[in-house]
Amino acid sequence: IMYDCCSGSCSGYTGRC
């Protein structure tokens, strides 16, 4: 599962913006 982490506030996951 990829999370949208633009600000980097997703449990340390680096997803696509």
Swiss-Prot record:
Q: Which organism is it from?
A: Conus stercusmuscarum
Protein's name according to its UniProt entry: Alpha-conotoxin-like Sm1.4
Stated family: Belongs to the conotoxin A superfamily.
Q: Which GO terms describe its cellular component?
A: extracellular region; host cell postsynaptic membrane
Q: In which tissues is it expressed?
A: Expressed by the venom duct.
Q: Which residues carry this modification: Cysteine amide?
A: 17
Q: Which residues carry this modification: Methionine sulfoxide?
A: 2
Where does it localize? Secreted
Native organism taxonomy? Eukaryota, Metazoa, Spiralia, Lophotrochozoa, Mollusca
* MF annotations from Gene Ontology: acetylcholine receptor inhibitor activity; toxin activity
Keyword Endoplasmic reticulum listed: no
Which key words tag this protein in UniProt? Acetylcholine receptor inhibiting toxin, Amidation, Disulfide bond, Neurotoxin, Oxidation, Postsynaptic neurotoxin, Secreted, Toxin
